[in-house]
Amino acid sequence: MKTVAFLAVVVLFAAFACASCSSSYAAPAPAAAPASSYSSVPAPPCPKNYLFSCQPNLVPAPCAQQAAPAAYGSAGAYTEQVPSYIGFAPYQQLQQYHQRIGNAALIDELRSLGQGIQGQQY
């Protein structure tokens, strides 16, 4: 019975693998997009950003300056250490944890072995 199920799985896998392979009957690949031949367009001048105000005279705001390169000096108010909440478990607790996992796996293995023996005849 197990052999028949295994063969069925192998046949289904082979059929799926053959179906996913590319064949000579596949649709041709689409044509490549034509190369663009745009002429270079100069960048527009800095726009005039008007600040909104209740005053009748609107004055354009100056363009933003480029950011200065990062300095490696003081970070000002952000110099505190980041708190660390993750600590190492003591060795004894870690050893007990691994022992419990091993015992649980052993118990599961013995249960499955016992169920297999009960179904057999001597």
From Swiss-Prot:
**What are the subcellular locations of this protein?**
Secreted
Give one GO biological process term: vitelline membrane formation involved in chorion-containing eggshell formation
Q: What is this protein called?
A: Vitelline membrane protein Vm32E
Q: Where is the VM domain?
A: 40-79
Read off the InterPro entries from this record.
Vitelline_membr_Cys-rich-dom (IPR013135)
Keyword Hydrolase among UniProt keywords:
no
Its family remark reads: Belongs to the vitelline membrane family.
* Main subcellular localisation: secreted
Q: Does the keyword Signal apply?
A: yes
What would be one Gene Ontology cellular-component term for the protein? egg chorion
The superkingdom listed in its UniProt entry is: Eukaryota
Hey, what's the signal peptide range on this chain? 1-19
Keyword annotations for this protein, in alphabetical order, are: Secreted, Signal
Please give the function described in this protein's UniProt entry. Answer: Major early eggshell protein.
GO molecular-function annotation terms?
structural constituent of vitelline membrane
